[in-house]
Amino acid sequence: MALTPMMVEYMKTKEEYSDCILFYRLGDFYEMFFDDAITVSRELELVLTGKNCGLEERAPMCGIPHHAAAAYIPRLVNKGYKVAICEQLEDPKEAKGIVKRGVVKIITPGTFIDANSSLENDNTYLMTIYESDERIGLAVSDISTGEFKTTSFDNIKITLLDEISKVAPKEILVDKNISQSLIDDIKGITTALITEKDFNEFIVSKEEIIDQFSDLEVSGLVNEREISSRVLLKYIYETQKMSLTNINLLEQYEIINYMTIDGNSRRNLELTESIREKSKKGSLLWVLDKSATSMGGRTIRKWIEEPLIIKSEIEKRLSGVSEAFSSISFNEDLRSSLKDIYDIERIVGKISNKNVNAKDMLSLKASLDKLPSIKELLGTANSELLKEYYENLDELSDIRELLESSIKEEPSLSIKEGNIIKDGYNSEVDELRQSKLHGKEWIAALENREREFTGIKSLKVGYNKVFGYYIEISKSNYNSIPEGRYVRKQTLANAERYITEELKIMEDKILGAEEKLINLEYSLFTDIRDSIEKEIARLKKSARIISNLDGISTLALIALENDYVKPEINEDGIIEIVDGRHPVVEKVIGRGEFVSNNTTLNQSDKELLLITGPNMAGKSTYMRQVALITLMAQIGSFVPASSANISICDKIFTRIGASDDLAGGKSTFMVEMWEVSNILKNATSKSLVLLDEVGRGTSTYDGLSIAWSVIEYITGNENLRCKTLFATHYHELVKLEGVLPGVKNYSVAVKKMKDSVIFLRKIVEGGADESYGIEVAKLAGLPDDVINRAKEILLGLEGENNFDIHKVTNTEIIENEVAVDINQANNVVTITEKACESKSEYIEKVEAKDSFDKAKSNKDDHRIDEKTENSSKKHKNKDSSNNMQLDFTFIEKEAFLKEVSEVDILSLNPMEAMNTLYRLVAEAKKLK
């Protein structure tokens, strides 16, 4: 058996678009067949049916009404599918044989804009990555706004991953020859759809990219930028099936002109979404984005993603914000006009894509109506930036007048249904409307006349697209119908429909005029659209100014509402913040509840602030606060503080919080070390680094050693010495102040009250004396038995009391089983035996363990001091359960002596010898 002719055509089309779900137009439905039908049925929960395709088995099939496609396509695209729309290219009534069909558009995650989406303030970016031996080229576009930009940089993987994290593309094009390891790394940081193409073949010509932009713009491209841009343009042509006139400016940018923030730091600082909810609420963007327009919202987001590092540019933006902040009436008038402006960028995108309707045109007109008042307002401005906006803002009065004269105030939604052109714009339209109106009046007169003639009051004249105009009479009035007056056309359950020759003649006149009118209005609308399309460059320029102006106005409004101050900007390596506040936490808990803190970082005595103190006390909040204030200053925003003097930072790095990568086979500690390694390799003397609890994912000695070494590396490396906030629970590190250059101790103030503590959340000079971990556990609601036992264990571990390892609570005793974990320089020894009844038996049990034998060379090394032995005997007499009392300090002392004896002084350089001596002295003091 062979496939039917229609199915043969379907299979040809499907083969060409094999990576897409094919929406195949059949009448009023889009149909999917075979695997596509199964996929769509599953993903959209549609009924799966079958269709005779000419084979023995029916082809799996599912379908959706064509008018409902807009509701279904986003769901597929958001799941990572591509959708190819195959339309009927001719009227089925006029077709000879199989109806001609063709794919008119491919909708992908990187090229789709959902008009009904709540994410209108977000960009939908499509990215191309081209990799040469030494360089990487990127091209990025949002086809809905017409943005198209490119950059290149040294072939360093982390730089590429950081840029992907910043741009957050929905779809990424890569060369099919790219390494799988790089693809895996990209997939590890983004959920974007990865599309592979052969860049040697999938690329537009040099002439095509020049036609899209200009010879001048293209001639300045280096090889990597040119190739990535040509590939990206090819993909846009392929998916849109046309050249988009709104993509008319090729912008080159340098990543070194913006602050570098890696993906991990963006996440930790919660710049655009919260860690917990993965939503805008709770992020810095949530605080700063009160934009009046969608364009302004995208601009605020872009500024947060790309802080400036050139002082003159920062101060220029700050000057605009400052003027809007200082003149409340100016900003209120400005925002009053801005709030009535629609998304001009995306309306222009619809014009370019031939997808604009009459209501979009009215939105454009309403937006342009506000430009004269905004221009007039800017004429009163004094700041350099606002003056530039005034000089460059095109009021677009010619376009506004065209729309004012041509588009009806309440047009049809579809441009193919008529009722879109305003009366008086075109004389032929006016004449046809009169003909149509007279025809409708004639129909109304006919209905009244027939009612009087027949005496049937319920008689009515109606219309539908199948039968045209008809006279409808209910069955109860059949006997009142004059014989021979009407011709029966249709029988219904409770009525009959009739026609007359006179009615059909008038129908032809009415419908003829209506059809002509609809076609004429459509033609006029496309002419208007094409006229405006020629002015896209002007529209985009004014839209860019409006979006930036909204960004400036919004930052001024936020500063006023939240009592922010204008920061001073310096390049001297000094960060001085007085009464700094965390912008997001303050917003959540309320200004009156938040405790402000001062911060001083410099390149002399306060290069690295070593912050100690308990959990829950506010260390992480404080550290993030400093980073966010710095970032806000560099986007040109006022900051939450009484005063701030911010040195420009080229990069912000954070290592905060615990996370693992189980899929990648990395533990929490491995991830932590990878992050620290990345920071130490890429930070510079102009960077701001936040390190929280480095080394906590391993044993105490290992963790302490790593944390210590990291601090030494940062402060001792002349090419690094970056401004650093270093929070730790290793209180031994406080002794580094005065020993290592630039280290300064700070802690979180705590107020003790009997058995409880109050965290004052105030950062003060000096190191913390306690961690208050048990108090935090108590605040968290742990049972009293657990808290009390923890205190007892703590006393034992600190050597202030004997430690009973058998006892779980003050009243319960473990049966005659004991598990003793002896930690010595990361070698863990576990003993699980019945309770030892004497010192000699305990030693024998220890000797039986191979791992412990390796750590201790002979039986003489296992000495239990007199205090422990006497205590054990005393406890044995008191308690028949034979519980063993151990003083764990003897293990630490023996380990310490062994470490001292094994130090090879001759193999150490002077710095290593000093460090070793300092560490051994510190450990010896603990064992007193």
Curated annotation (Swiss-Prot):
Cite the CDD domains for this sequence: ABC_MutS1 (cd03284)
Tell me the keywords, alphabetical order: ATP-binding, DNA damage, DNA repair, DNA-binding, Nucleotide-binding
Coiled-coil positions are none
Pfam families registered for this protein in UniProt: MutS_I, MutS_II, MutS_III, MutS_IV, MutS_V
Matching entries from InterPro entries are given as:
DNA_mismatch_repair_MutS, DNA_mismatch_repair_MutS-lik_N, DNA_mismatch_repair_MutS/MSH, DNA_mismatch_repair_MutS_C, DNA_mismatch_repair_MutS_clamp, DNA_mismatch_repair_MutS_core, DNA_mismatch_repair_MutS_N, DNA_mismatch_repair_MutS_sf
Q: List the disulfide bonds.
A: none
What terms describe the molecular function in GO for this protein?
Answer: ATP binding; ATP-dependent DNA damage sensor activity; damaged DNA binding; mismatched DNA binding
- Family designation: Belongs to the DNA mismatch repair MutS family.
Query: What job does the chain carry out?
Result: This protein is involved in the repair of mismatches in DNA. It is possible that it carries out the mismatch recognition step. This protein has a weak ATPase activity.
Q: What is this protein called?
A: DNA mismatch repair protein MutS
> Which source organism?
Clostridium beijerinckii (strain ATCC 51743 / NCIMB 8052)
The opening ranks of the lineage are: Bacteria, Bacillati, Bacillota, Clostridia, Eubacteriales
